[in-house]
């Protein structure tokens, strides 16, 4: 009888441990994947990826002035003062882990301003190919990467570009908010989507 009780208690103990492990695994899965099905890549994970191969991070621009009641920075087609603060905060966090990158933006005021505030003085190259997005965006990314194959790349673009890439590469429905981003890389001439960038 005593042996049975000990066996029963032992079984319950193992069961509780298994439940705890399952709960932890569930939390890890929740943290690792977005609700849209894209892997979540935080700053530290991005830094580890960048050690394996150069990364390409595409961000949507900051809060646009013409769709907000917040104070405009300057031009109504640009971003808000809040947008500049958000872009600078994101840039500081990003640069702490990925200090070396080439910076690009599409040829709109809002993306140029976002990239400028994000980078805090880094040289910016404006490239109109990141305004109208479709399959050609991959050629543009590969072109930039081929010019500096060992450099990380940051591109400020638009929500429709990010939505297109997520759907095309992973069949994911991605509706990016301001300054949301996607992480990609180029390998053997092909562009791969690694996941959604999460700033924390």
UniProtKB/Swiss-Prot annotation:
Give the pathway listed in the UniProt entry for this protein: Bacterial outer membrane biogenesis; lipopolysaccharide metabolism
- Reported EC number(s) for this entry are 3.1.3.-
Q: What is its main location?
A: periplasm
Q: Where in the cell is it found?
A: Periplasm
User: From what superkingdom does this record's organism come?
Assistant: Bacteria
- Example GO molecular function term? phosphatase activity
The family database entries (InterPro entries) matched by this protein are listed as:
His_Pase_superF_clade-1, His_PPase_superfam, LipoPS_heptP_Pase
Question: What does the record give as the function of this protein?
Answer: Catalyzes the dephosphorylation of heptose(II) of the outer membrane lipopolysaccharide core.
Q: Which family does it belong to?
A: Belongs to the phosphoglycerate mutase family. Ais subfamily.
What name has this protein been given in UniProt? Lipopolysaccharide core heptose(II)-phosphate phosphatase
Query: What's the source species for this entry?
Result: Escherichia coli O9:H4 (strain HS)
Q: What is the lineage of its organism?
A: Bacteria, Pseudomonadati, Pseudomonadota, Gammaproteobacteria, Enterobacterales
């Amino acid at each position: 009888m005593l042996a049975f009780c000990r066996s029963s208690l032992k079984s319950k103990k193992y069961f509780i441990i298994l439940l705890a492990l399952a709960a932890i695994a569930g939390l890890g899965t929740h943290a690792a994947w977005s609700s849209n099905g894209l892997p979540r890549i935080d700053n530290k994970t991005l830094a580890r990826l960048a050690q394996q191969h150069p990364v390409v991070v595409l961000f949507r621009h900051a809060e646009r002035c013409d769709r907000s009641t917040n104070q405009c920075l300057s031009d109504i087609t640009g971003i808000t003062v809040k947008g500049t603060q958000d872009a600078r905060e994101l840039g500081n966090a990003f640069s702490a882990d990925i200090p070396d990158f080439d910076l690009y933006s599409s040829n709109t005021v809002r993306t140029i301003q976002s990239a400028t505030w994000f980078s805090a003085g880094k040289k910016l190259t404006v490239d109109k190919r990141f305004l109208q997005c479709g399959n050609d965006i991959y050629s543009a990314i590969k072109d930039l990467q081929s010019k500096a194959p060992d450099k990380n790349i940051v591109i400020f673009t638009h929500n429709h570009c990010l939505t297109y890439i997520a759907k095309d590469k992973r069949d994911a429905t991605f509706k990016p908010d301001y300054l949301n981003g996607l992480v990609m890389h180029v390998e053997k001439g092909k562009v791969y989507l690694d996941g959604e960038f999460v700033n924390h």
